[in-house]
């Protein structure tokens, strides 16, 4: 986007930026001087951009997620779950997250003993074959193990607790749905922006964060604590829901139309 934005601005074409993360990327910081407006999803972005250009819009999310809260029964049926059990969704994205998968392997025997809990474990296409062979004959009955999620909206709908990376898109979806979440920021991103994304929620009592370097040892204990504490899950859900912005796409579009 850097070269395109620069050429456009130099040619007199109005430039609107969207910064999805709580810590601005290098390209957007360089283009900020030439931009007409800068759409952001987090408070405090005047640290990086001229205050007068900032528009607080949030990040656009998929419209199919808007109905996910009311689709629990459909999700339970789709993923073959028990409606009377609490459900944990563990996801590392389409390719998967190695550290989260290692943590799941580490805690699998413990999870097997959680009789009132079931887990959707989306391991990612990159790790699926290796894990399938490694865990042959060892997968607990209360764990649904899969490389990817065919219906992300229904997986969210089932979940009483989510374990996920802290990418901007994922966080925006979780805010919209009001899901209690354990965020495990990826260390393999520019300027450690996922940790900053996660901390923006933690500081508002809207999420729990486990560092990637600690997730193998800590994840099971954190999950168990939250599953046993309905009050803490409810509090996390209520706080994260206050951060939701449902019409981000429309707000951004209107701002663009104003300068055309």
PLM segments and residue spans:
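An aromatic- and histidine-rich active-site surface loop
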Residues: 1-11
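Active-site-proximal region of nucleotide-activated glycan assembly enzymes
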Residues: 9-73, 81
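Short, glycine/polar-rich helix-capping loops at beta-to-alpha or helix-loop-helix junctions
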Residues: 24-27, 41-49, 130-131, 170-171, ...
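Donor-nucleotide binding loops and adjacent catalytic segments primarily
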Residues: 71-77, 81-162, 194-198, 203, ...
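A short, well-ordered alpha-helix in the C-terminal region of glycosyltransferases
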Residues: 77, 232-246
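A donor-sugar binding/catalytic signature common to diverse glycosyltransferases
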Residues: 152-194
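Conserved acidic donor-binding segment of nucleotide-sugar-dependent glycosyltransferases
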Residues: 208-214, 225-230
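C-terminal alpha-helical cap of glycosyltransferases
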Residues: 246-260
């Amino acid at each position: 986007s850097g070269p395109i934005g620069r050429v456009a601005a130099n040619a007199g074409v109005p430039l609107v930026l969207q910064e999805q993360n709580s810590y601005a990327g290098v390209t957007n910081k360089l283009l900020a001087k030439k931009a007409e407006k800068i759409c952001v999803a987090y408070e405090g972005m005047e640290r990086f951009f001229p205050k007068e250009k900032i528009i607080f819009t949030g990040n656009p999310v998929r419209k199919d997620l808007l109905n996910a809260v009311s689709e629990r029964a459909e999700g339970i049926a789709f993923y073959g779950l028990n409606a009377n059990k609490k459900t944990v969704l563990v996801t590392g994205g389409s390719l998967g997250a190695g550290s989260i998968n290692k943590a799941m392997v580490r805690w699998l025997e413990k999870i097997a003993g959680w009789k009132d809990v079931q887990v959707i474990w989306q391991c990612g296409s990159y790790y699926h074959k290796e894990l399938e062979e490694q865990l042959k004959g060892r997968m607990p009955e209360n764990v649904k193990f899969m490389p990817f999620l065919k219906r992300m909206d229904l997986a969210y709908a089932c979940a009483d607790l989510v374990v996920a990376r802290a990418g901007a898109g994922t966080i925006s979806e979780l805010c919209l749905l009001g899901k209690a979440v354990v965020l495990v920021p990826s260390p393999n991103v520019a300027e450690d922006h996922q940790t900053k994304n996660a901390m923006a929620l933690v500081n508002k009592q809207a999420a729990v964060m486990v560092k990637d370097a600690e997730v193998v040892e800590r994840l099971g204990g954190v999950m168990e604590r939250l599953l046993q504490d309905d009050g803490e899950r409810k509090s996390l859900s209520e706080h994260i829901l206050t951060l939701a912005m449902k019409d981000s796409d429309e707000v951004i579009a209107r701002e663009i139309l104003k300068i055309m």
